[in-house]
């Protein structure tokens, strides 16, 4: 039993180290401007559905309910942008809300599209969780690499401290915005807006 537990701990530590290395490499590419945004057509609803499917298993394993309250007709349309990076942003934020949540908690994803004119629109999505929340002081530094909150319940979770800096950098590259509201012991809400071109074809 002791040997089995030791192997399990070693596997968790190895996975954490691999995640950290991958995040550091990706952040380095962003800072060196070696990441190229796509400009391709994609279906927004399919992208959101794909991201949610990838995260549902992890949520289920942790006893957390992942809900999608998006407006299906609003997001079921073809847009032009960088789907690979938008998907990464959604998955990172969903993973965050799942990781720092409590057994029996919920994570709710909601999205819509707000037309700006005939050619451009805003993809707007919100991720709301019933997790452990964040202190106001930590929120001031959340986009700094390796930012960790070590004096409360978050310290027992193994985060790399790179997820939010990557998310913020990718959103900035696309000319979007992210806002976070959080309350300790209650949960957090992430609101993102990303400008996209409307696919006319």
Labelled PLM ranges:
Residues 28-39:
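Helix-loop junction within the histidine kinase core
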Residues 134-148:
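Short conserved segment of the HATPase_c
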Residues 38-53, 87:
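A conserved beta-strand-to-alpha-helix junction within the catalytic ATP-binding
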Residues 58-70:
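Short conserved segments within the C-terminal catalytic ATPase subdomain
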Residues 97-98:
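Short helix-loop "hinge" at the ATP-lid/N-box region of the Bergerat-fold HATPase_c
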Residues 12-17:
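Short alpha-helical segment of the dimerization/phosphotransfer core of two-component systems
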């Amino acid at each position: 039993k002791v040997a089995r537990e030791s192997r399990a701990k070693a596997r968790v530590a190895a996975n954490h180290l691999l995640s950290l290395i991958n995040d550091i490499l990706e952040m380095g590419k962003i800072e060196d401007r070696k990441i190229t945004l796509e400009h391709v057509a994609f279906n927004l609803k399919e992208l959101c559905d794909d991201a949610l499917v990838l995260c549902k298993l992890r949520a289920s394993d942790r006893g957390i309910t992942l809900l999608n309250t998006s407006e299906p007709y609003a997001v079921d349309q073809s847009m032009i942008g960088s789907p690979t990076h938008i998907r990464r942003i959604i998955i990172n934020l969903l993973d965050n809300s799942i990781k720092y949540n409590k057994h029996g908690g919920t994570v709710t994803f909601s999205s819509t599209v707000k037309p700006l004119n005939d050619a451009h629109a805003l993809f707007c999505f919100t991720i709301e969780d019933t997790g452990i929340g964040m202190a106001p002081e930590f929120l001031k530094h959340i986009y700094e690499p390796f930012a960790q909150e070590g004096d409360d319940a978050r310290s027992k979770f193994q985060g790399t401290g790179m997820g939010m800096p990557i998310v913020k950098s990718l959103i900035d590259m696309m000319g979007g915005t992210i806002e976070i509201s959080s309350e300790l012991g209650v949960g957090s809400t992430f609101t993102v807006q990303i400008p996209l071109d409307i696919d006319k074809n």
